[in-house]
Amino acid sequence: MWGRLWPLLLSILTATAVPGPSLRRPSRELDATPRMTIPYEELSGTRHFKGQAQNYSTLLLEEASARLLVGARGALFSLSANDIGDGAHKEIHWEASPEMQSKCHQKGKNNQTECFNHVRFLQRLNSTHLYACGTHAFQPLCAAIDAEAFTLPTSFEEGKEKCPYDPARGFTGLIIDGGLYTATRYEFRSIPDIRRSRHPHSLRTEETPMHWLNDAEFVFSVLVRESKASAVGDDDKVYYFFTERATEEGSGSFTQSRSSHRVARVARVCKGDLGGKKILQKKWTSFLKARLICHIPLYETLRGVCSLDAETSSRTHFYAAFTLSTQWKTLEASAICRYDLAEIQAVFAGPYMEYQDGSRRWGRYEGGVPEPRPGSCITDSLRSQGYNSSQDLPSLVLDFVKLHPLMARPVVPTRGRPLLLKRNIRYTHLTGTPVTTPAGPTYDLLFLGTADGWIHKAVVLGSGMHIIEETQVFRESQSVENLVISLLQHSLYVGAPSGVIQLPLSSCSRYRSCYDCILARDPYCGWDPGTHACAAATTIANRTALIQDIERGNRGCESSRDTGPPPPLKTRSVLRGDDVLLPCDQPSNLARALWLLNGSMGLSDGQGGYRVGVDGLLVTDAQPEHSGNYGCYAEENGLRTLLASYSLTVRPATPAPAPKAPATPGAQLAPDVRLLYVLAIAALGGLCLILASSLLYVACLREGRRGRRRKYSLGRASRAGGSAVQLQTVSGQCPGEEDEGDDEGAGGLEGSCLQIIPGEGAPAPPPPPPPPPPAELTNGLVALPSRLRRMNGNSYVLLRQSNNGVPAGPCSFAEELSRILEKRKHTQLVEQLDESSV
């Protein structure tokens, strides 16, 4: 649902959120599309550094020594600013001890991410030493590091007043004239504060009877030299940018607000502040804060801030990146706003807010303001009145400062509106630099880091921004944590969880023609007519000869012949009725594809079988009128560039053969089909013949085997004996009695085969068991057992023998049985038993 409502919601809020006619600008005009997309595989001129540590989020560039100092988790690195990946780097291992990690884990902290020494602060302390602070497993420590030897000292300083305990908390810090100015959440209780340490007069914000800071997350701080060329002898000031809970937008007391709405703020303190003498002792006497508005009510969370021209206060301005408020958790969008220092100064010189006890709400203070003005720095005018420092200020002024830290007016962006609203993007950090072009004008060039590892390079043009390119700087998606620009090295350094990458500030060689070079509108790039190439302005001796058009991006190449070689003519031939694709890739995301037929007829999507897509032109159901010369043009910013040229020929389709007369039913089968049928029938006949022969052969073999075996018969019992089924064993002839046996076999079936005769009549009781056989037969063999043993897998059952048909003589039964048993020893097992097993 949100995916469908989001464009409409953004458009409505963009046009109506902030009053004023200048803010009724459609969101589609503010949502700039990057002109070029450079994936990770197409990066050129980059350098990488990755050590054994993680979270390379703290960067310090020292241009004079050409060193890039990096603070990571458990380590510090000193890299060559010229090439961070040259391998000639120095490293300091600064890990938290196992005992400290164990204590951190026992306090309920995560031993996978939090219980380490995350280096959060790294600045130049003096000409010989650096100053670094780390979380040290929720026991912060700081150290002065020898810059030349790049080694840790033997002793450390406690860092609980200088560094956050939690590595995930916002932090910003500066070293100014030896004093350490930091803003973060201090101590284990995570108390937000702005503090000054390593100074004869340590200061912090007020906590009672009201908090000057409410659940603040700090983003950025900067020193502005307002004392330079000041006609009133003003003091230098430190500006802090952060997001906090807004107490003025809901009912609440001094100590607790009932509102959870978070807003962006800007605060300032004077560098020469010494605190109060009796009131606000060791507290800031110059602290003031104001709301920072970019685009309400959506964009309230401050993500990144950069300052330009901070050395000259009259030209100092800031760029800030905002994301959606915390209640919009399912949407991603960012806004970029610009703020002038003069506007911030005007707000701090305006009316104050006051907590009104009667209504228990914050409102505009309407009473009188004491003198000297509360929150102001000591100037020449105040010195002439005897106020040489903040400790000389009257108690009335200090009491007013204590209760009125918030200004009534908000700080609005330049021209009252954002420069950019970007959907589906979350900016995490930004930096910028002013670039003076060969023609004279100066443009602000910004580099915006995203939460998924991309860098947007943009130039500020009046009330908007033009995104020159978007570059994927990491193969894996990860957040950009820090950005630093080196003008001497012409490089951008990117800090991220996995490492540091060095990018060139410009990639002018990507643009191959004059039009492509000026359409990019990169302040660093211009077309050189002498070398017929797009070159960086910093590398050209005669910079005035370069062709540039940053404002409009379409002028300067009219008289130049460096429009690039025309594309070769490609031929395509297709049959009538077929489809054909004419490829054409647009190099710019801002270009519109334009197709012309025979140089004049423009083709649109859906017209006469044409389909215009991002990858080319599709001609469907080609007809003879589709033949001709096709040109693919890129139309961008009023310029037209030929990208591809085709000559298409549509050939007539081959006529189909005339259908034959229908064949008769008897002749409808093709000759080859008949032949297959005949062969199949012949094969089946042959198989049947082979099968019949095999069966006949097997039958003959079995008949022969039966003739050689002894014959068994199943005789019918005497009718007088009853109708029960009886089995009789008829012994075969003994050797020497073949003739007699044959005669008997010819005379009746009872003596030659085994018969099963079903019983008839009523069932009769079983006959009495036969008398036991004698101990020894007449042939000298002992009586057979009542059950024969299993031999060679065949079972033999001794059947009751009748007195009839028992052959006399010593060899009638015993010899026959011995011969059968001897034969069975050498008989192969069969799967199915036959009558020979009985």
Curated annotation (Swiss-Prot):
Query: Taking every annotated instance into account, which residue ranges of this chain make up the domain Sema?
Result: 35-505
Name the predominant localization. membrane
Q: Where is this region: Disordered?
A: 723-777
Intervals, Extracellular compartment = 18-675
Q: Which residues are glycosylated?
A: 55, 111, 126, 388, 542, 598
Can you tell me where the transmembrane regions are?
A: 676-696
Which UniProt keywords are listed? Cell membrane, Developmental protein, Differentiation, Disulfide bond, Glycoprotein, Immunoglobulin domain, Membrane, Neurogenesis, Phosphoprotein, Signal, Transmembrane, Transmembrane helix
**Pro residues compositional bias, start-end:** 763-775
| Positions on the Cytoplasmic side per record topology | 697-838
InterPro entries associated with the record: Ig-like_dom, Ig-like_dom_sf, Ig-like_fold, Ig_sub, Plexin_repeat, PSI, Semap_dom, Semap_dom_sf
Its subcellular locations are: Cell membrane
List residues, modification Phosphoserine: 795, 837
Domain called Ig-like C2-type: residue spans = 567-649
**Membrane-topology descriptor:** Single-pass type I membrane protein
Q: List the disulfide bonds.
A: 104-115, 133-142, 270-377, 294-337, 508-525, 517-534, 584-632
Q: What are this entry's molecular-function GO terms?
A: chemorepellent activity; neuropilin binding; semaphorin receptor binding
Its subunit composition reads: Interacts with PLXNB2.
Provide the function of this protein: Cell surface receptor for PLXNB2. May play a role in axon guidance.
Tell me the protein family, please: Belongs to the semaphorin family.
Q: Know the name of this protein?
A: Semaphorin-4G
Species of origin reads Homo sapiens (Human)
Q: Which gene encodes it?
A: SEMA4G
